[in-house]
Structure formats: structure tokens, C-alpha cells
């Protein structure tokens, strides 16, 4: 599975990949640093070789996925979103990836984890 990120998600995605490997799940990371100019051809080349893609975003609306799709036409296989104002922790991503690989949906952090 390829985890796609942008902005502040870089480090937590890398930590998550290490934990996924410990759980027997092979994952890699494609991270976008520059939005303008967006290198759509290079992005398509990389994304088209991925077996399964999940985008990790710290927002409600899936802002980067919409931008990626508008620039490349590429639609990711899954989404992990967190929008409670707190950053992702690796277990959020690991649990969501595991759930999506089982066929479930994991769009955001469960409500009970938001209320502290």
C-alpha cells in the first residue's frame, strides 16, 4: 500500500510505515512538498505503478485529494482524515490502513478519540 501525504504528515506517515511493517504489511510513502508548480506527469508516473493508494490528510474535506485529482485525474483507493485540530499519531494511520485493507472504511479518527 502506498500512503500519500503532503505538508505536516511526512514524519507520522514514516513512523506508521515502520509499525505497519512490524504487523506484516508492506507500505511505502509518496510525499508531495510542492503544489505550485505541480508536476502532474511525474505524479501520474509514480501513482500509476502503485497497487493500492491511501491518502492521509489533516483536514475534513480531502483538500489535497481533490487537488491531486484535478491536476492528474487520479483517484486514490482510500482516505484517512483527521480534523479535530490535533496531529495524527502513528496508531491512527496504522489502524485505519488495517481497516481499509480488510475492506472497511476509515475516513477519520473515531469520534470517541476526539473527546478527551
Which residues make up each language-model segment?
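Peripheral docking tails and interdomain loops at the edges
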Residues: 56-116
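A structural preference for short, hydrophobic beta-strand core positions in alpha/beta folds
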Residues: 29-31, 78-79
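Glycine-/small-residue-rich active-site loops that bind phosphorylated ligands and cofactors
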Residues: 8-9, 35, 60, 85
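Short, well-ordered alpha-helix to beta-strand connector turns
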Residues: 50-51
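Redox- and metal-dependent alpha/beta enzyme cores, enriched for Fe-S-associated oxidoreductases
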Residues: 1-30, 36-42, 105
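An N-terminal assembly and electron-transfer interface module characteristic of large anaerobic redox
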Residues: 34-37, 42, 91, 114-116
Amino acid at each position: 500500500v502506498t500512503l500519500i501525504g503532503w505538508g505536516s504528515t511526512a514524519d507520522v506517515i514514516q513512523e506508521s510505515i515502520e509499525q505497519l511493517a512490524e504487523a506484516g504489511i508492506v507500505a511505502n510513502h509518496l510525499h508531495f512538498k510542492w503544489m505550485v508548480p505541480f508536476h502532474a506527469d511525474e505524479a501520474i508516473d509514480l501513482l500509476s505503478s502503485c497497487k493500492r493508494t491511501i491518502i492521509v490528510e489533516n483536514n475534513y474535506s480531502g483538500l489535497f485529494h481533490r487537488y491531486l485529482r484535478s491536476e492528474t485525474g487520479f483517484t486514490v483507493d482510500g482516505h484517512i482524515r483527521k480534523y479535530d485540530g490535533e496531529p495524527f499519531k502513528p496508531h491512527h494511520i496504522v489502524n485505519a490502513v488495517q481497516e481499509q485493507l480488510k475492506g472497511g472504511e476509515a475516513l477519520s479518527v473515531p469520534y470517541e478519540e476526539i473527546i478527551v
